[in-house]
Amino acid sequence: VESPLIAERISNAEIVITNKTPISRTTIDKCPNIRLIAVLATGYNVVDYNYAAEKGIPVVNVPTYGTASVSQFSIALLLEICHHIGHHDKTVHEGKWAENADWCYWDYPLIELEGKTMGIIGFGRIGQAEGRIAKALGMNVIAYDLYPNESGRVIADYVTLDELFANSDVISLHCNLTPENTEMINRNNIAKMKDGVILLNNARGQLVNEADLADALASRKVAAAGLDVVSTEPIKADNPLLSVPNCIITPHISWAPKESRSRIMD
């Protein structure tokens, strides 16, 4: 339920600056003086931008501030999935290595990325930045985007969405949330993916049907997921993804290094 305080506090404003506070059709109608809405983020789905456009109100965002931090974080999630660094560090500090009969041990299968295929859905600035890192790791990169461009072709081969699902060892989401792609990661599309695929989501939680993903993680159709976003934030205690062990969830921090936060204000 939308708080009435939103419209109350911006009722006389001409310029509205927001981040996570929603600006809905109802709020826009209650605030006739608004001339500009600025979203201090890359994603702007907190604003009913279609209705704002109907009313002649520009909606602007900050599309470049988090390119480096979000792409870096996405790869960090992937490397944690591949090597379980946090777990092994914890067991060493708990004494397992000191007590081990062999000179080393690993508690999970470890994964080498070279030669594997990363499929990136949403190949704008962040997707392309992640693609460059993936290529530096020796991965093959394919991408799906509604608007392919030449800078992307230097990094990846553009493919259809079904081709990406079928051929990717790792799938990474970096697309805007729209009515058309809401819950695009669902039971039907997961069935098109390779067995043992890894899923990364640093875009919007609503891109994923969380119950379907939890089922796929439990069956190991999806080997692991690294998520910095979920459908409702903060996460609800009954989110089904909390019950599956092969799912890393972080509290929407990929954007948050000091350097990127400074760029928002610049």
Say what each PLM segment does.
Residues 19, 40, 77, 174-177, ...:
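Short, well-ordered coil/turn residues at beta-beta hairpins
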Residues 127-128:
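N-terminal Rossmann-fold NAD(P) dinucleotide-binding loop
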Residues 63-117:
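Phosphate-binding beta-alpha-beta segment of Rossmann-like dinucleotide-binding domains, i.e.
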Residues 1-60, 166, 186:
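An N-terminal-biased, well-structured beta-alpha scaffold segment characteristic
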Residues 253-266:
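A conserved FAD-binding loop/helix module that cradles the flavin
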Residues 123-124:
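Glycine-rich Rossmann-fold phosphate-binding loop(s) that bind the pyrophosphate
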Residues 24-28, 140-142, 146-240:
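Rossmann-like adenosine-cofactor binding region
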